[in-house]
């Protein structure tokens, strides 16, 4: 499976959470079957791309029948994590970190932040949301024992690489990086970079382009 996963286009991997969320919604509504046309209309993704995306993972559906919703849901769950609940750590309890801890993926039953870390004495030991903030000195030992799936990085940019090094040394294989710093990690560690400033600028460019085209 590892070789197969490495050959899956990045664009396909980025669409998987969209498919998963939709399938989960269909399952909650009691719908037991869905076809690519319905998925296409719900997500504004063309049917050919959906069928191609799904083809990377083998036979997920049957011609003339479509896809079994419950089977798709279990499939996507297995691709996200081997466990029922995805445990997440957070490093850097500033304004953004506190907001994420307070939110704590409340609409996603399968994801929860269980550990948080900071260097400031006035933050360490406090409770944000339902999570008690640990000191950075304990990061590696706690991450190793807690067996977290991923860590969210919300430190100042100047502290990002050092924090990332400690996260990697603890055995975590996924980092969601909210800092403006591009961190260096080994090839077997996945990093998803989220720069809110860049995202906003991108939105403004799209808006301006749309205005000009009209």
UniProtKB/Swiss-Prot annotation:
Major site of localization recorded for this protein: cytoplasm
Pfam families found in the cross-reference section: CoA_binding (PF02629), Put_DNA-bind_N (PF06971)
Annotated residues for binding of NAD(+): 92-97
A Gene Ontology molecular function term of the record: DNA binding
Gene Ontology, cellular component aspect: cytoplasm
DNA-binding region range list: 18-57
UniProt keyword terms in alphabetical order: Cytoplasm, DNA-binding, NAD, Repressor, Transcription, Transcription regulation
One GO-annotated biological process of the protein: response to redox state
Keyword Transcription: yes
Subcellular location: Cytoplasm
NCBIfam families per record: PRK05472.1-3 (NF003989), PRK05472.1-5 (NF003991), PRK05472.2-3 (NF003994), PRK05472.2-4 (NF003995), PRK05472.2-5 (NF003996)
PANTHER family referenced in this protein's UniProt entry, alphabetically: REDOX-SENSING TRANSCRIPTIONAL REPRESSOR REX (PTHR35786), REDOX-SENSING TRANSCRIPTIONAL REPRESSOR REX 1 (PTHR35786:SF1)
Family: Belongs to the transcriptional regulatory Rex family.
Subunit structure: Homodimer.
Name by which UniProt lists this protein: Redox-sensing transcriptional repressor Rex
Gene: rex
